[in-house]
Every structure is written in C-alpha cells, then in structure tokens.
Curated annotation (Swiss-Prot):
It catalyses: 4-CDP-2-C-methyl-D-erythritol + ATP = 4-CDP-2-C-methyl-D-erythritol 2-phosphate + ADP + H(+). ATP binds at residues 91-101. Its EC number is 2.7.1.148. This is 4-diphosphocytidyl-2-C-methyl-D-erythritol kinase. The active site is at 9, 133. The gene is ispE. Catalyzes the phosphorylation of the position 2 hydroxy group of 4-diphosphocytidyl-2C-methyl-D-erythritol. Keywords: ATP-binding, Isoprene biosynthesis, Kinase, Nucleotide-binding, Transferase. GO terms for molecular function: 4-(cytidine 5'-diphospho)-2-C-methyl-D-erythritol kinase activity; ATP binding. It comes from the Bacteria.
Length: 277
C-alpha cells in the first residue's frame, strides 16, 4: 500500500493572450503550489482492473485518475491491478487543480510501481493530454506558464500564506470561455514585470465570474476588505495573500463560505517520491 499527498495550486494571475486555430486559448500565468492536499492510496489487488474509491458518481471513463492509469498501462513492465482510494480535501470545480493533481500523482506513482521507466518529460507529455494543468504537478515546481499552460519556466517564489475562499457554486469553464466579453488579447508580459508590480496582474476570468456567479462576487467583496482578492483559474475559489495587518482567525471565522489558510510550497512533496523496494 502506498499513501501519498496530491497538492493544489493557485494561479497568481491569469491572462489570455490569444486564440489558436484549433480553438485553444494562449495564456500566461504563474502556478503556485500550496499545502492543501488530497490523499491518494494505491493498493495492489489480484484482479486485473483499476478500482477507484472516493469520487462519487464520476464515470470511470471520464475519471482523470483512471485515464492516467490507462495511458501508462501499455508501458508497464510489472502491471498489477489496483484499488485507488482518494480522500478529497481540494474542492472540485474550484480552480485549484485538484483533478489535474490527482492525474499527475497517478502517473508519478504508477510509473514506478509498474516499472514503466518513463522520464519526467515523457510523463508530462502524457499528462498534457489529460489536462493543461497536469504537467505542473508532474514536475512539482512553481512555474511561469505559457501556451495553453504546458510551456513551463520554473521560478523561485517567496514563501507566503494565503486565505482561500470556496464560494458555494460550481463554475462552468465552458460558459466563461463562451462569453463574448471575455478578454482574449491581453498584452504578453514577463515574470520580471510581475515581480515589479504583482498587484497589476489580475485574472481575465474574474469580471465574468463575478457577474455570472453572485457567490463569487460576495467572496471577492469580503476578501477585498482585508487585502487584494484574486480569482484562481476559472474559479470558483478566490484568494488573498496574508499580510501582517490581517487578523487571520477573524477573517476565517466570519467568511461567507468555506475558508482555508494555506501555505505556499517551494516544491511538491512528490518531487522526490520513490516506491520502497
């Protein structure tokens, strides 16, 4: 039995800079890993199948964990059936990358457990087929991202704490992308520019999320009283960096929805994962 953490991420900003002919959007963002974890347990079983426990009514063929395992199966030198249990702490549909992280964790663990012998780069190439956020969790380092999110430049970020709010709504990414008022032509920028004035960098999805989802608007207004609230991903989660002036316990206590205090990570706990021999 192997039990490992599967971390979440924040988008410290998110700009859409263009659109490809295939419909995919070009973007720029910073991925910040945080210490909010799902926990995944991998247990070999005698049956030649993948069993998944803990994700409710998600159909197996649509499950990113199952799909990750199926991608690796042809490369397995020592295949075995598995019971995979997931303990969810990262809210779903929140912009925190929980599903992508779970897929990446599955690729990392099974690459060793099944003796696939694939490199980190090969795992990332498989991962991007499952979702644009998956490679960041494969590499397990904070990064400046471009393209559809798959072109990564690893960066060193200061240690910080964040208050994260999860409004009681599920945001449709497709709905936000379909809005004609979505800004799709942000001017490309650089990490150096971000470092000089991070408060100038927002999220192109934020105005739409606030307009279409009153719960997001309420959470943003609440956090804006204490700091600079931002949307992560396409939402629904919003966050603000903790400052010395904040009474964190009081902010968490009176939040209008589920609230978390999280810490930034320099790297994923899976960065140096090894299956015990």
């Amino acid at each position: 039995m192997i039990r490992v953490p599967s971390p979440a991420k924040l988008n410290l900003f998110l700009h859409i800079t263009g659109r490809r002919e295939n419909g995919y959007h070009e973007l720029q963002t910073i991925f910040q890993l945080i210490d909010l974890y799902d926990w995944m347990t991998f247990t070999p079983i005698s049956e030649d199948e993948i069993q998944i426990e803990g994700l409710g009514e998600v159909q197996l063929e649509q499950n990113l964990i199952y799909r990750a395992a199926q991608i690796l199966r042809p490369h397995a030198q020592n295949p075995c059936g598995l019971h995979i249990k997931i303990e969810k702490n990262i809210p779903m549909g929140a912009g925190l990358g929980g599903g992508s992280s779970n897929a990446a964790t599955t690729l990392i663990v099974l690459n060793q457990l099944w003796q696939c012998g694939l490199t980190e780069e090969q795992l990332a190439q498989f991962g991007v087929k499952l979702g644009a956020d998956v490679p960041i969790f494969i590499y397990g380092l904070n990064a400046w991202a471009e393209g559809i999110g798959e072109h990564l430049s690893f960066i060193d970020l200061d240690q910080k704490q964040f208050i994260v709010l999860k409004p009681d709504c599920f945001i449709s990414t497709q709905l936000l992308f379909s809005q004609k008022t979505l800004t799709r032509d942000s001017k490309p920028t650089t990490f150096c520019a971000y470092q000089l004035e991070p408060s100038n960098f927002g999220n192109n999805f934020e105005p739409l999320a606030r307009e279409l989802y009153p719960e997001v608007e309420e959470a943003m207004q609440y956090l804006d009283q204490f700091g600079h609230a931002k949307l992560t991903g396409t939402g629904a989660c919003v966050f603000a960096e903790v400052t010395d002036e904040m009474n964190v316990d009081d902010i968490l206590k009176h939040a209008p929805c589920k609230a978390y205090l999280v810490h930034s990570l320099k790297e994923s706990p899976l960065r140096h994962f090894k299956v015990a021999s």
